[in-house]
A protein has these predicted regions:
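Extracytoplasmic
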Residues: 62, 171-174, 221, 346-534
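Membrane-interface alpha helices of multi-pass inner-membrane proteins
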Residues: 120-122, 155-170, 176-181, 208-209, ...
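Hydrophobic/aromatic-rich transmembrane helices and adjacent perimembrane loops
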Residues: 174, 300, 306-346, 362-368
Length: 535
């Protein structure tokens, strides 16, 4: 009890330290900028600054809060990558602080909280994976608080956290919503079991009321049925493209990282087995309320998150695992029977898990990326250098792909020969192009080729593009056939109306074609490129 009280007394300083250290670490690792996948959110956030909203004005696969936060960051900081860098770094920092809080609430141990948080930071999820760390840490903290003191206020807090997770990505809300219901049903109370249905009803009602405004918005601008259908179509295409992976461990090129897949599944199963072993313990219902919801969420999240390629997807499943590891270690430290064997087995398992985490997260490579080894005595200079790079529009190390780097002369041409009202049709996975070009995307699609197809979606895109001014279309050669087959109506529109303006060679296999609308009358010719001007 004294240890638990001391942990609660010291948790705020440790949470602040976790926030500061993690935020600084993630910020300094942005030496090579954001991966192009992250620009799905940066570009969409930039689009929102013009008053164009997801679902109403452009396709949203179910991530409204990620888009809104990117927009808010750019509105506050400016339309530069620094805005997203601060958002993402602080989100990971907040996730670390909340993990400390969740584990202290769950175990009463500050040491285990620090260990769990260190593993979470070490596995290093991709920048766009910050919600998978942040919302799970926040909701697990709410779960643990409710188990420790089941009050109506904490029921509502759980509902708020779950709805926040839903708005980040809808499946997060589903997984964590189920976990919240299990937490309420399993938390021991003074009365009969049926009395737990009352807080469950409050939880469901609060969540429903909180999410109703968003559902009403979706119904108003497109309809819930159409939204759900489009989301399912998108999810199915993503699942077909990025399937769940069960890698070989022995003989694998990276056995420690591959082993982490099985460790992520083993941890919740072992936690449930340990729970069964405690079935005669007077604390069993309390343990069940702590473990079963997190284990259930872990298994659902594992199956959903752990997809190909593992190098980018595997770290996303870290939070349920480290929370359960902390709980298991606490049970091991409390063991009386077979204590030496339990501690030895637990130590070996922890070492294996830690080694897998460090390997999967490339911890030492990421530390090297911060340049702290080389300039450990000048941290402020390092921060200044990184900030300067993130404020530049075309800092070379901040450009995510060779194709986009090759388009910089085109972006500079757009500054000279187009207006902010002009849009770009992006026919391939170059989702970062509108952001660097400082031009909005057209047709309500950040890009074609990996987004929503189908005849209904294409007709909506055509209606939108006919109401917009779209002088240019950018078509990378590796997506040309996909546009022709999947977006045949868009392809027909482009062939009838656009002509080739120039080609940008990227590699022997990749060429980016820039098409121009042949029906638009130019005001003159650009002196540097001789391309048509439309200002």
């Amino acid at each position: 009890m004294n240890q638990s009280r001391a942990a609660h007394d010291w948790r705020w300083p440790v949470m602040i330290a976790a926030f500061v250290i993690t935020t600084g670490f993630r910020y300094l690792t942005l030496a090579d900028g954001f991966p192009n996948d992250h620009f799905v959110y940066i570009t969409a956030g930039w689009q929102m600054l013009f008053g164009e909203w997801p679902t109403r004005d452009w396709v949203d696969p179910g991530l409204p809060l990620m888009f809104a936060l990117s927009a808010l960051a750019q509105a506050v900081v400016g339309e530069v990558l620094l805005a997203e860098a601060l958002l993402v770094s602080m989100a990971f920092g907040l996730a670390a602080a909340l993990t400390v809080a969740a584990v202290v609430e769950l175990t009463g141990s500050l040491g285990l909280a620090v260990l769990a948080t260190a593993l979470e930071v070490a596995v290093f999820p991709r920048t766009y994976g910050y919600p998978k760390v942040l919302v799970y840490a926040a909701v697990f903290w709410c779960f643990a608080r409710y188990v420790n003191q089941p009050t109506p206020r904490r029921v509502v807090a759980m509902a708020i956290a779950v709805v926040g997770a839903f708005l980040f990505r809808h499946d997060h809300g589903l997984f964590l919503g189920i976990g919240g219901a299990l937490t309420i049903l399993l938390t021991p109370g003074d009365g009969p079991w049926r009395h737990r249905l009352r807080p469950l009803a409050v939880y469901v009602a609060a969540g429903t009321l909180l999410v109703l405004p968003y559902l009403a918005y979706v119904q108003l601008y497109g309809g819930i049925a159409s939204y759900v259908s489009a989301g399912i179509d998108f999810s199915q295409r993503e699942a077909a493209r990025q399937w769940h992976v069960w890698p070989a461990v022995f003989g694998d090129a990276d056995p420690l990282a591959s082993a982490l897949v099985y460790e992520f599944y083993a941890i919740p199963l072992v936690a449930l087995l340990v729970l069964v072993a405690f079935r005669r313990d007077s604390r069993w219902w309390r343990f069940a309320a702590q473990v079963v919801p997190v284990a259930a969420v872990a298994l659902m999240a594992n199956y959903n998150f752990i997809r190909d390629p593992l190098v980018t997807r595997l770290p996303d499943a870290i939070v349920p695992a480290v929370v359960l590891v902390a709980w298991l270690l606490m049970r091991g430290l409390e063991a009386r029977r077979y204590r030496p064997a339990i501690l030895a087995a637990g130590t070996l398992a922890l070492l294996l898990f830690s080694a897998s985490v460090v390997r999967a997260g490339d911890l030492f490579g990421n530390i090297d990326r911060t340049s702290l080894w080389a300039e450990w005595d000048h941290p402020l200079r390092l921060l200044g250098t990184r900030t300067s790079e993130l404020q530049q529009r075309f800092a070379r190390r901040q450009i995510p792909t060779r194709a986009t780097a090759g388009l910089i002369p085109f972006f500079e041409y757009l500054d000279r020969c187009s207006t902010p009202d002009h849009r770009l049709l992006v026919g391939g996975y170059l989702v970062e192009v509108p952001f660097f070009a400082r031009r909005r995307f057209a047709a309500g699609q950040p890009y074609f080729g990996g987004s929503f197809g189908g005849e209904e979606g294409q007709r909506l895109a055509l209606r939108r593009i006919r109401e917009e001014i779209v002088p240019f279309a950018i078509i990378p050669s590796d997506y040309a056939s996909a546009i022709e087959s999947r977006f045949y109506l868009i392809d027909q529109y482009l062939r009838a109306r656009y002509m080739l303006m120039t080609e940008v060679p990227v590699s022997d296999e990749l060429v980016v074609s820039i098409l121009v609308d042949s029906t638009m009358v130019p005001s003159g010719r650009d002196r540097e490129t001789s391309w048509p001007c439309f200002r």
